[in-house]
Design a protein with these regions (language model features):
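Short, compositionally stereotyped local motifs that mark structural "simplifiers"
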Residues: 20, 737-884
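Extracellular Ig-like/FN3 beta-sandwich strand-entry sites
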Residues: 245, 712, 810-814, 958-960
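Short acidic/polar inter-strand loop motif in beta-rich domains
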Residues: 723-726, 822-826, 967-974
Length: 992
């Protein structure tokens, strides 16, 4: 009786809490981001749920990464897993499609047209009318179970559901098994896409009796069986012709060892009450959304905010089963202990804003994320970079699980871990930072990543430096001074790629690459250009300002960032969207930049710019995101900015104040306290802070701290249409991120080219500027000395070769150089290699190569330096959408017996071998005779990056050799870039 009384009281309390919550679901539009390039999906998910049940309207292409695009007119069916806002495609598992009449397993035949006017998308619920069948499809879910409700027309036509396991990704293996007695179908699907071996089991049950199941393998019907297996398995499930409605519940398991193991997850839905599951999902969403309450009369702003908050609560996804079992990175099944395990960690995006937001309002899940990271380290030897369903995709850069761990530690989330466990976290950080890949060895050796060793070298250097700062701070907190000293030095390596203008500038062969255009999007940056990456020094920004020349210079650079032309050059990069000047809000590298004015005493400019971004680049419409949602990062930026502050440097516990968007916002903290933010006089035109109070006391700092928030309080702003240029300005009022120099900046070896005919003169300089006035810099620095060698030995202070001026060489030479400072010691040693080659022939190019892929100029094809398999390192001339044609002049008539040309194929990157190469020879450059033809034998859909030499061996006498290579042409339908023009990549022409 007592237990019953307690249960009744608990139910009453739950009901009271539910009634007390505001119905915030009504303000969410899951269709936001499904148009333009947002890459979101509109279907049903519960907060951070392991099932994402949503319609699939697109099978291929970049804008089909989530399987749904608002511009599409047909639905192929409803699959149970989807990615939100990613730039790569995966998931779309276990597709169901209801039908009436004649059924087919061919997707072009069973798909149906639909109309957005008959479509409803809400948190935890989706419905649409399938025009072809006149069937109403409704979807809802629990964390592990997708629930469908199909309402059929009242006729006597055949009715049923198509199950398609071939849908979208390459299938490695699949099984469909029918248990007639249990009215149940179970199966599995192993597939390959972004995750090269994703495993998923399913168990589905039906509210109506199955009358018949037809099995299909390779789209051919297989009779008299109850189960099928293969790489193309489908089934047609029939119900009675008078069936009016069917509810289907589909449980998923990524940990299953046996075919029926997903059954245990069906416990979440013990019956077929669709309404109850829908109501539960709705309440779960209201509970999450009520963590932040906003007050405003602007309904549009309220919709934008709560849709953004909704997207923040969709990923990462729950990965373990109801019993805690999950599949690890080692492919084995493990048991989670006192935590949940999650998947889909888009950390290059989400460490910036999503994880800091969750560390503030969802400490329990943040703890689970750190627990998950450590399981990855135990099972895979490293912390995750971009993990997807127990698979490290190696997508994007950095080791950004580290700032998530450090930020959690700073906020006390990891206090319950033992000292030993925290030390293991530090060990995991160090091990991940020192992996022998992705330019990390070169970064440690040279103090930056040379672009001729690793692509995206500038971005990687900058992001590694920030992550290393996080490692250093964590080591310091744990009393590990040796680790601190090592990584605090590494965190200043950004200085080694900074040029005189303050731009982060790629370096190769010991010096800065030239020509250089900060607007050029190229392989030295990750989905960006130098404008968008140059201010990325969040942990030491004020030192960066000093090196640039002071606050006045920094202000001009920031003003130019937002005020210059939005035109970019170089590679077409679909991710670079939402441009304001060269600031690209549609991608992550510059998300912090609008807040940097606070660091130089101009917070009113931050207020103006953040308000402009919020109002111009976010709406409540399907195209309401200006770029990929990126698993919550794009929305988290908005949520935090609407609060009025943003974590420029995750882990330092500072929030940089921008412009609060709402009249009142209440953050309901997990400890029961509330942090309330008010903005008196706020309107769409009044974005400027006039004054502020924190807990009733005058507040004139342009930042707040975690300690100001964690126990609740009030932050009250008074807003105006005019800026108060004095508020938040002053040494003690503005944020400052700087620490003492602990490294000596490396020198730069400067030469006009790497190869030469007779002699070459190079110089060596230090590129650290010295400020002599507010506007003038002396270059190079005069406080350091440079030592160098030209015989390949390591330079040292006692070397006789202290650099004093230009040096001329006449032979192949390896130059090594080091700079020295009395306070900070030696810099890392850098090196450059120069080659003398016999210029016994010249080349005339009849095709124009892409500016991005010049390999150093016209003579690159004759310089004796061959391009590598990784085309991003340079060394290849690229020709897009055209044939390659050139004429070689041997300078005299000669006997030859061999002509060879090197070509590259990297199909994923649109680089495909030419279909053929034709060579002609001539003595007078007028009358040419055929020399030979080479026909390509490698398939275009061979995705292995490879180099082939097209060679023709035949005696001939000539002076001129004309070479023509035929382009593959337009990329076919099977390619992700279908319809685009392929590239020819060529390097090194040999004549013997």
């Amino acid at each position: 009786m007592k237990k019953l009384a307690v249960l009744m009281i608990t139910m009453l309390l739950c009901g009271a809490i539910a009634n007390a919550q505001e119905n915030l679901v009504q303000y969410v539009n899951p269709l936001v981001g499904t148009d333009f390039h947002g890459h979101t999906y509109p279907g049903a998910i519960v907060p951070f749920g392991g099932v994402q049940l949503s319609p699939d309207t697109r099978l291929h292409g970049w804008d089909g990464c989530s399987a749904y695009h608002y511009s599409d007119e047909v639905i192929y069916g409803f699959s149970h897993t989807h990615l939100s806002g990613t730039g790569c495609s995966d998931y779309g598992d276990i597709l169901l499609m209801p039908f009436t009449g004649q059924a087919s397993v061919i997707n072009s035949e069973y798909c149906s047209k639909f109309s957005h006017s008959k479509e409803i998308a809400e948190p935890g619920y989706y419905s649409v009318m399938l025009d072809k069948y006149n069937v109403k499809a409704e979807l809802t879910c629990t964390p592990h179970v997708g629930v469908h409700r199909y309402t059929y027309p009242a006729d006597n036509m055949p009715k049923g559901i198509i199950l398609d396991l071939k849908h979208r990704d390459m299938v490695l293996n699949s099984v469909i098994s029918y248990d007639a007695k249990a009215n149940k179908i179970v199966g599995l699907r192993d597939s390959k896409a972004w995750n090269e071996n994703q495993k998923l089991n399913f168990s589905m049950m039906f509210s109506q009796p199955i009358t018949k199941v037809e099995f299909y393998v390779n789209d051919q019907r297989v009779d008299s069986v109850n189960a099928i297996t293969g790489t193309n398995c489908k089934a047609i499930i029939y119900f009675a012709e008078n069936t009016k409605q069917v509810v289907v519940k589909v449980a998923l398991s990524a940990a299953a060892l046996n075919l029926n193991d997903a059954d245990k997850n069906l416990k979440e839905v013990p019956d077929f009450d669709f309404h109850k599951v829908h109501h539960s999902a709705r309440e779960l969403w209201n509970e999450e959304l009520n963590k932040i309450e906003v007050e405003t009369n602007d309904l549009e702003l309220k919709k934008v905010f709560y849709t953004a908050l909704y997207h923040c609560f969709t990923s990462p996804y729950l990965f373990n089963d109801v019993d805690g079992k999950y599949r690890g990175l080692d492919g084995l099944t493990h048991q989670a202990k006192e935590h949940n395990v999650y998947t889909v960690f888009s950390l290059w995006d989400t460490y910036r804003a999503l994880h800091p937001l969750l560390a503030l309002i969802d400490r329990k899940r943040t703890d689970d994320f750190v627990y998950t990271f450590m399981r990855h380290y135990e099972q895979g030897g490293m912390l995750p970079v971009w993990e997807l369903a127990a698979y490290e995709t190696w997508c994007m850069i950095g080791y950004h699980s580290i700032p998530v761990i450090w930020d959690a530690y700073q906020k006390g989330i990891l206090d319950h871990y033992s000292d030993y466990e925290k030390l293991q976290m530090l060990n995991a950080m160090v091990a991940s930072a020192k992996l022998n890949l992705l330019g990390r060895p070169e970064y440690a050796k040279y103090g930056f990543i040379p672009s001729d060793f690793e692509h995206e070298s500038v971005s990687k250097t900058l992001e590694y430096a920030f992550d290393d700062w996080c490692i250093a701070q964590f080591a310091k907190a744990l009393g590990q001074d040796d680790v601190y000293q090592e990584f605090i030095k590494r965190s200043q390596f950004y200085k080694n790629i900074m040029d005189a203008e303050g731009f982060m500038h790629p370096k190769a062969n010991g010096g800065f690459l030239k020509p250089f255009n900060p607007k050029e999007i190229n392989n030295h940056f990750t989905e960006a250009n130098s404008w968008q990456y140059s201010t990325y020094v969040p942990h030491d920004f004020n030192t960066y300002v000093d090196l640039m020349g002071g606050t006045a210079v920094a202000e001009r650079l920031l003003d130019s960032l937002f005020g210059t032309s939005s035109l970019t050059s170089g590679r077409e990069q679909v991710d670079v969207t939402g441009l304001i000047g060269q600031y690209a809000h549609g991608n992550e590298p510059s998300h912090h930049a609008a807040y940097l004015y606070n660091f130089i005493g101009k917070p009113w400019k931050t207020q103006r710019m953040t308000d402009s971004i919020m109002q111009s680049l976010y709406t409540s419409q399907p195209d309401g995101l200006c770029g990929n949602e990126d698993c919550g990062q794009m929305s988290a930026w908005y949520v935090l900015s609407a609060m009025g502050f943003y974590p420029v440097c995750p882990g330092d516990n500072h929030y940089i104040i921008g412009s609060p968007m709402f009249d009142k916002m209440t953050i309901n903290l997990e400890n029961g306290q509330q942090f309330v933010i008010t903005a008196a006089n706020r309107s769409r035109n009044a974005c400027y802070i006039q004054s502020a109070k924190l807990n009733g006391q005058k507040y004139d700092k342009s930042y707040i701290t975690f300690d100001d928030i964690k126990d609740g309080g009030q932050l009250n702003f008074v807003m105006s249409t005019k800026p108060n240029t004095k508020w938040g300005v002053g040494k003690d009022k503005q944020p400052e991120n700087r620490f003492e120099p602990v490294i000596t900046v490396v020198p730069s070896i400067n030469a006009p080219q790497q190869t030469f005919k007779d002699q070459l003169t190079f110089t060596i300089s230090l590129h650290k500027p010295v400020q002599v006035s507010d506007s003038k810099l002396v270059f190079p620095a005069t406080t350091d000395k440079i030592y160098f060698t030209t015989d390949g030995t390591e330079p040292a202070r006692n070397s006789r070769l202290e650099y004093t001026g230009p040096v001329t060489i006449t032979e192949n030479t390896t130059v090594k150089a080091v700079s020295y400072n009395e306070a900070t010691g030696y810099s890392p040693v850098i090196e450059a290699k120069f080659y003398r080659f016999a210029q016994d022939k010249t080349i005339t190019l009849h095709s124009k190569y892409s500016e991005m892929y010049s390999a150093g100029g016209d003579n690159a094809l004759l310089d004796g330096i061959r391009g590598q398999t990784n085309f991003r390192l340079g060394g290849w001339q690229g020709y897009q959408g055209k044939d390659f044609e050139a004429t070689i002049d041997l300078l005299n008539v000669k006997d030859i017996h061999h002509v060879g040309v090197g070509f590259l194929q990297d199909t994923r990157s649109w680089i495909i071998f030419p279909t053929s190469m034709t060579v002609e020879v001539s003595e007078d450059n007028v009358h040419f005779e055929p020399y030979g033809t080479y026909t390509n034998q490698v398939a275009a859909n061979d995705y292995e990056a490879q180099i082939q030499e097209y060679s023709i061996d035949k005696p001939a006498r000539c002076r001129y050799i004309r070479i023509k290579a035929k382009t593959f042409g337009t990329l076919p339908d099977w390619h992700l870039g279908a319809g685009g023009d392929s590239h020819i990549f060529v390097d090194e022409v040999t004549v013997e």
